[in-house]
Amino acid sequence: MEELTERQREILSFIVKETETRGFPPTIREIGEHMDIRSTNGVNDHLKALERKGYLNRGEQQSRSLVATKRARLLLGLGARKDSGMVEIPLLGKVAAGAPLLAQENMEDSVKIDSFLLGGVNGREVFALRVKGQSMIDDGIHDGDYLFVKKTPSAQPGEIVVALIEDEATVKRYYPEGDRIRFQPANATMQPIYVSRAEFRSTMILGQVVGVYRKLQGGRTP
C-alpha cells in the first residue's frame, strides 16, 4: 500500500476532525485555507491521491462529499468507527434557500440516519428539512439536500440557521448588525434579507444547521 506524504496525512486528519466536529466534511476551499494551499487544483491533487491510495471516497462535483474510509481511521489511530446507532429524525418540510417557500411545522415524514452524522448532537434535538433553491451553494448546500437542524432559538454570528421570516422558512447565515439582523445567502448573485431589531423575535430562529445529507447521482455511494 502506498504511503501518505505528511501533507496528505494532515489533510486527511483535518477532513476527519471537521466531519466529526461539524457533522459534515469541509469544502475544498476550507481545506485550502486550513492548509495554506492557495490553488484549488493543489488541494484536488492531494484529494485524488488520497482517493487513489484508498483513504478517501468522494462524489463527483460535490463540495461536501468527502468521506474518510475505515483504512483512514485506522491509520490515524481512531480505529474503525463503531456503529453509534440509528436515530429517527422528523422531516418537517422544505427550506427556501432562494425565494422563500412556506414550510409548515408539520411532520411530512421521518428519516433514519446514523447518529454519527449529527456530530455529537442528541438526535432528539434535531429535525430535518429539505432545501429548495440555490442561495447557499457557496457553503456546499444545494437544491434537494437534506439539512439536519438542531432546535435552538439563538445563534452565534456567522452560523448557518433556519429562520422563519414572515411565516416563511429560509436557510441563511446569521449576522446581528447594530439595529438590524442580516440573513446572508452564500451566493454572490443573491441579496441578503434584513430584519430590524424591533421586528426580530427569538422565535424567528428555528435552529442551527449541524449537518447536510445529499444523495449522489448515478447510484454512486461514498
Swiss-Prot record:
The entry's DNA-binding region feature spans 28-48
The text of the family note is: Belongs to the peptidase S24 family.
What this protein is called in its record is LexA repressor
- Primary gene name: lexA
Q: What is the lineage of its organism?
A: Bacteria, Pseudomonadati, Myxococcota, Myxococcia, Myxococcales
Q: Name one GO cellular component term.
A: protein-DNA complex
Q: Which GO terms describe its biological process?
A: DNA repair; DNA replication; negative regulation of DNA-templated transcription; proteolysis; SOS response
Q: Does the keyword DNA damage apply?
A: yes
Q: Name one Pfam family in it.
A: LexA_DNA_bind
Top-rank taxon of the source lineage equals Bacteria
Q: What does this protein do?
A: Represses a number of genes involved in the response to DNA damage (SOS response), including recA and lexA. In the presence of single-stranded DNA, RecA interacts with LexA causing an autocatalytic cleavage which disrupts the DNA-binding part of LexA, leading to derepression of the SOS regulon and eventually DNA repair.
